[in-house]
Amino acid sequence: MKKGLFVFFVAVLLVSFSQTFAQKSGTGNWFAYFGNQAINKKWNWWNEVQYRNYNFIGDRQQLLLRTGIGYNLTENNNNLSLGYAFINSQNYLPGTEDKIGFDEHRIYQQFLTRQNFGRVFLQHRYRIEERFLPDDFKMRFRYFLSLNVPINNKTLSANTIYASIYNEIFLNS
């Protein structure tokens, strides 16, 4: 088991290392805060702030503010949510130093479900977004999958160090 885990981590490291050299953009960063506050056993309040920069710091690319209310269908496993997001984007025009800014408003609905198989914890998120852009309206469907494996514990409890792999698929209409 330990040999298999070691091989897995080495493979992830090698794939990540090769992908690092494939990037063509400069240094940037992405600060994020995620909060989930229980209102009672059935209801929760979700909030999120993401601040993204070009050129390491001070050159804003995007500010995302998202909040929502969730209802637990089952304890710690299945949650339905409804929410709103405000996004301010500052994108560079291709081949120039000029930026164009715009605001986007999103209403979203999502279903979150969690599963565990021994020490492997999976999370699936299905989200539908109604996107209100300047002079346009679009729909987007998203599927997010994360896999977490605790390293120093058998469960994902407080102060647990864990490995995480995740990805998300976006389908724009």
Which residues does each PLM region occupy?
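Bacterial Sec-dependent N-terminal signal peptides
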Residues: 1-27
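Start-of-domain marker
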Residues: 23-90
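Short loop/turn motifs that connect adjacent beta-strands in outer-membrane beta-barrel proteins
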Residues: 25, 41-42, 74-77, 116-121, ...
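Membrane-embedded beta-strand positions of outer-membrane beta-barrel proteins
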Residues: 47, 80-82, 111, 124-126, ...
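Residues that define the transmembrane beta-barrel architecture of outer-membrane proteins
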Residues: 27-29, 61-63, 103-107, 137-143
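Transmembrane beta-strands of outer-membrane beta-barrel pores
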Residues: 49-55, 84-90, 115-117, 128-132, ...
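Residues on the lipid-exposed face of transmembrane beta-strands in outer-membrane beta-barrel proteins
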Residues: 33-37, 67-71, 109-115, 128, ...
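Outer-membrane beta-barrel transmembrane domain signature
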Residues: 123-173
